[in-house]
Amino acid sequence: MKVQFYEEDGHTLAVFGGEWADTNKTQVLCFCIEEGHVGATPDYLATLKRATKYKAQQLFEQLKNDYYYTDLIAEY
């Protein structure tokens, strides 16, 4: 699975799957984890910065143990 990490306005977002190049056709999942909030958001966050792969892997390990998000992430 492709996992990318971004930061915007003090929030950390992880993007699972998809490609940023074609924002009209590709829907990706963004997870905001700074405040324990996890949710889906559109894929037009073009100004976000890439963060470390290590941090992205940490989030994936955390989410894959959650029953609900295991099914959600498995689609990607």
Predicted regions and their residues:
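Short intrinsically disordered terminal tails
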Residues: 1-2, 71-76
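A short beta-strand micro-motif
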Residues: 2-10
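Acidic, low-complexity, intrinsically disordered interaction modules
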Residues: 11-73
